[in-house]
């Protein structure tokens, strides 16, 4: 079990014990469980806890709570660690024995539930919280009963990512399923799409759109501008099973612990590689960037392909994204988030002063690696964005490409592509351990804040249909290789369409997907555009790296003023 699944199980047991104590025993204290749950949760988040905070969490009077904590320390369930040089202040932590016992306890609960749902005990395909349809063949989409007499039309604003292309190409089908007319407005340019979403909510009149598909890193900016409606209370009353969604997808759609969108397309940035070519030259799939560069050198000498690798390097947002994702593989987000441990950073920025990391060692290394890739990349690399570099790979012109998973449809569903059924998938290679990770991208469906109040239930039901397992499967069958939910990825029919789903499911369970690489600062889009322009001059116009990164840091610092 990974950290996310343990946390979900803990929350589940918390609720069941609370229900038992309230409904059966009328005892709401349950102090020992509350202590253990509190200690384990904070340990997972690498947060310091004290004797006082544990007593407060226990629900016991202070003196009784103090005796209980001392007893648990004596029993070696908890351990003390000196916090200050004076030795008079301590932090409290779970002992290794408690962590092991607690993990085994939660695992036994998971296995019991899995067994009763028809999964074999210790079956790794069961992920706690996934839909009951997981592992089964998901049926065709069912029709939505629109009982509203007032609302017979939905207006959707989005870009042209693969999932939205499926909707637009099959409007008659979706109108039949949703029992309403659909007005689908597509804006291909991401900057223009962002501005459209913002301007729509600036108006004092009602919103022009009912649903907006927003790029995940925009959530901070859209939340700060009150552009989107917080969805938490509507989710609770609409019957959404958010636990079936990948944790990374839900977190990436949230800001300051509020949910502003429901994931419709969750896509990690991966390394695609040609298995047949790698096998031909005895190359191992690269897990580190030095291994990738070594493979590039061998492939360049072989003349097997035009270029060993392709990746997005167009000036502005595409290049900046490649840069900050590379920074993540060298162990740093582009802003100074708190490091929890391993490959995890805390997304809570309430207690820190935000600064950018463009003068960090990771930034220098990331820029240098991108520069070192240029001799192994297409001659028109500086013109390539996401679609162009995947198309290059799909035509057999490169042996590797770094890009978002959804674009795998260009070769996985194209029998004429040399990469068809010949592609392997990996998290992005590590610059330093343990950062072989893939940052999460994609789109979520949000509701404009100036929508008519009485239309919200109808719109929520529409969103629920658009992200249901049946509809997600329909997107996949029609060309969008993306699933934000566990249950669809476990459908045997879906798995036969492309090996990418098995690989993505495994990466999610192994916690290879991270949200912190593109932390959604309210000024994210402006910072990224500036950084992409500056990096372009270093990579293609030979500007000095130190000067380039100093300029990135300076321009980003000016844009951070908006946060204050």
Mark where each language-model region is.
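Short acidic, hydrophobic short linear motifs in intrinsically disordered regions
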Residues: 45-56
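C-terminal capping/gating helix-and-loop segments adjacent to ligand/active sites or protein-protein/ligand interfaces
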Residues: 163, 438-439, 488, 502-556
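Hinge/lid segment of periplasmic solute-binding proteins
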Residues: 216-269, 426
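Glycine-centered hinge/linker elements that transmit conformational signals in sensory
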Residues: 296-298, 338-383
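Conserved N-terminal structural module of periplasmic/extracytoplasmic solute-binding proteins
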Residues: 117-220, 547, 555-564
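Extracytoplasmic/periplasmic substrate-recognition and gating elements
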Residues: 281, 375, 413-483, 514-517
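Short, Lys/Arg-rich nucleic-acid/phosphate-binding segment
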Residues: 82-91
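N-terminal leader segment of winged-helix/HTH proteins
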Residues: 1-26
């Amino acid at each position: 079990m990974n950290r996310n699944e343990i946390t979900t199980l803990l929350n589940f047991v918390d609720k069941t014990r609370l229900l038992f104590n309230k409904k059966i025993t009328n005892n709401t204290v349950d102090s020992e469980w509350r202590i253990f749950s509190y200690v384990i949760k904070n340990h997972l988040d690498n947060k310091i806890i004290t004797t006082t905070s544990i007593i407060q969490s226990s629900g016991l009077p202070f003196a009784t709570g103090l005796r209980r904590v001392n007893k648990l320390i004596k029993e070696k369930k908890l351990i003390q660690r000196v916090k200050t040089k004076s030795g008079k202040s301590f932090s409290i932590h779970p002992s290794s024995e408690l962590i092991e016992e607690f993990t085994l306890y939660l695992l036994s609960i998971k296995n019991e539930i899995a067994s009763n749902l028809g999964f074999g005990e210790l079956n790794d395909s069961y992920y706690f919280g996934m839909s009951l349809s997981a592992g089964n063949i998901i049926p065709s989409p069912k029709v939505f009963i629109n009982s509203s007499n007032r609302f017979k039309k939905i207006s959707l604003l989005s870009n042209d990512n693969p999932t939205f292309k499926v909707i637009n190409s099959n409007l008659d089908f979706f109108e039949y399923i949703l029992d309403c007319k659909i007005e689908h407005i597509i804006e291909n340019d991401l900057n223009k799409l962002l501005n459209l979403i913002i301007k729509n909510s600036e108006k004092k009149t009602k919103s022009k759109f009912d649903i907006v598909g927003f790029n995940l890193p925009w959530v901070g900016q859209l939340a700060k501008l009150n552009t989107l409606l917080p969805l938490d209370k509507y989710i609770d009353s609409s019957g959404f099973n958010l636990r079936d969604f990948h944790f990374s997808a839900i977190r990436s759609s949230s800001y300051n612990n509020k949910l502003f969108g429901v994931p419709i397309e969750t896509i990690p940035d991966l390394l695609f590689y040609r298995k047949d070519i790698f096998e031909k030259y005895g190359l191992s799939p690269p897990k580190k960037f030095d291994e990738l560069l070594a493979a590039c050198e061998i492939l360049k000498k072989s003349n097997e392909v035009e270029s060993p690798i392709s990746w997005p390097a167009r000036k502005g947002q595409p290049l900046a994204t490649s840069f900050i994702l590379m920074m993540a593989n060298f162990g740093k987000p582009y802003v100074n988030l708190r490091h929890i441990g391993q490959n995890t950073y805390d997304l809570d920025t309430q207690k820190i002063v935000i600064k950018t990391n463009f003068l960090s060692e990771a930034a220098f290394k990331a820029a240098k690696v991108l520069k070192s890739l240029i001799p192994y990349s297409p001659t028109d690399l500086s013109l390539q964005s996401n679609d162009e570099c995947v198309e290059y790979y799909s035509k057999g012109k490169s042996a590797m490409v770094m890009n978002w998973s959804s674009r795998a449809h260009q070769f996985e569903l194209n029998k004429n592509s040399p990469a068809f059924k010949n592609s392997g998938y990996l998290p992005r290679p590590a610059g330093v351990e343990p950062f072989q990770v893939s940052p999460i991208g994609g789109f979520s469906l949000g509701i404009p804040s100036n929508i008519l109040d009485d239309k919200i239930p109808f719109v929520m039901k529409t969103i629920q249909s658009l992200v249901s397992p049946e509809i997600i499967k329909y997107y996949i069958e029609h060309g969008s290789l993306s699933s934000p939910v566990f249950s669809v990825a476990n459908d045997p029919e879906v798995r036969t369409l492309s090996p990418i789903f098995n690989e993505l499911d495994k990466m999610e369970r192994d916690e290879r997907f991270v949200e912190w690489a593109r932390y959604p600062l309210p000024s994210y889009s402006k910072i990224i555009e500036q950084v992409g322009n500056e990096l372009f001059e270093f990579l293609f116009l030979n500007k000095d790296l130190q000067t380039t990164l100093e300029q990135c840091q300076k321009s980003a610092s000016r844009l951070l003023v908006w946060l204050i």
